[in-house]
């Protein structure tokens, strides 16, 4: 297996109001018996990623109950599996995840003990169908440090400022990344799917932790200008 998967499913969305008062956004019902997270899980297994970690935090009960039926996604193989990580309160750690990078760092042992050379990171509440293998192939072909899956929004869409807005050159390299700007400079947005080498992710997370930084987008994608960031147009198939 070339990549392991990580699904970030711990966030709370105040925009959903009462809908998310007792349920994680990733556990929201979609067309009956499905949950929002099923799309990311299905994309993982359909892309032959058989080792997947889900990071949960907010209103985890219904989400964890749903994830316990992992046989639905065929993650039960000998060298794979579905792993669920929630914040662990210990003598050395007395707080919940302080951000997406902190969630990854608190579980860095999982990354260090894995052997896959690449990591695919996805949001647990994205509703889409996507072949992560195509993104991985583009990542390797470009020699990228980090690949960000993006999509062009229709000009003038009201909710474009809910996303990370990307400016890129003609080769697809990211030259500017602004998280949830008040005024968007382009209509190209990140859909919250990233590919990165596992060892490089570990190094960046350790640097962030040493500097007291906790957010994957703000403190890694936006801050580390030395990284070769490229876009993938795989999301155009959505």
Model-derived features: positions:
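Conserved small/polar residues in nucleotide/adenosyl-binding loops
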Residues: 230-238
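Structural signal for conserved beta-strand scaffold positions within catalytic alpha/beta enzyme cores
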Residues: 29, 84-86, 148, 176-179, ...
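Structural motif
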Residues: 5, 82-83, 118-120, 145-148, ...
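Catalytic donor-sugar/metal-binding loop of nucleotide-sugar-dependent glycosyltransferases
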Residues: 222-229
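Cytochrome P450 catalytic domain signature, combining two hallmark sequence patches
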Residues: 72, 209-214
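Conserved N-terminal catalytic core of the sugar/cofactor nucleotidyltransferase
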Residues: 1-8, 12-15, 19-21, 25, ...
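A conserved hydrophobic position in a structured secondary element of the catalytic/binding core
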Residues: 58, 122, 196-197, 216
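Conserved core of the sugar-phosphate nucleotidyltransferase
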Residues: 129-199, 203-211
């Amino acid at each position: 297996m070339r990549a392991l998967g990580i699904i970030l499913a711990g966030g709370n969305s105040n925009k959903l109001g009462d809908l998310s008062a007792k349920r994680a956004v990733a556990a929201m019902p979609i067309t009956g018996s499905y949950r929002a997270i099923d799309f990311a899980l299905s994309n993982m297994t359909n892309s032959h990623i058989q080792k997947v970690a889900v990071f949960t935090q907010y209103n985890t009960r219904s989400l964890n109950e749903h994830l316990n039926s992992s046989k639905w996604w065929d993650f039960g193989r000998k060298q794979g599996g579905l792993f669920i990580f929630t914040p662990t309160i210990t003598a050395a750690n007395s707080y919940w995840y302080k951000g997406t990078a902190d969630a990854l760092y608190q579980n860095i042992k999982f990354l260090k003990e894995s052997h896959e050379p690449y990591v695919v990171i996805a949001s647990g509440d994205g509703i889409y169908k996507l072949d992560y293998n195509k993104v991985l192939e583009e990542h390797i072909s470009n020699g990228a440090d980090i690949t960000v899956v993006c999509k062009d929004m229709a000009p003038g869409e009201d909710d474009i400022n809910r996303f990370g807005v990307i400016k890129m050159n003609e080769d697809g390299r990211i030259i500017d990344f602004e998280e949830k700007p008040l005024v968007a400079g382009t209509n190209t947005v990140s859909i919250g799917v990233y590919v990165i080498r596992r060892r490089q992710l570990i190094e960046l997370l350790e640097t962030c932790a040493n500097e007291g930084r906790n957010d994957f987008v703000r403190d890694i994608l936006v801050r580390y200008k030395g990284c070769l960031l490229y876009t993938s147009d795989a999301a155009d198939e959505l």
